[in-house]
Amino acid sequence: MPIPGQDKDREATANILCMASAHANSVFVAAADRVGVERGKPFVGQSLIVSYTGWPIAGPASPDREEIIYAEANLADTRRKRNWNEYNQVLRDRRTDVYDEMLGAKLSRGWY
């Protein structure tokens, strides 16, 4: 379903979020949505497949007709090629010390 305020002539917000998530986590993302209206609710379609770089490798599909999209994905590339350069290694450079306690990595009483 479209996000409130979404311009129907622009790319679906969900697709932009998929691209950002794929890039930030160095993973391939396949996002599928149906098209048309069900129970009075519209669906935006525009399914897509995104590379670990954040760029689409298939799609977006049609916003108003059924369509199947395909892409080749070398899953080994997510590990082998995710380090852009020595100063930009997204997963290595995460600051888990900032949020690990909140996620339960360091259990201590009363943090919540």
Q: What kind of feature is each model-predicted range?
A:
Residues 65-85:
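A short, polar/charged loop-to-alpha-helix boundary motif
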Residues 21-25, 53-57, 73-75, 83, ...:
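Glycine-rich loops and low-complexity Gly/Arg-rich segments
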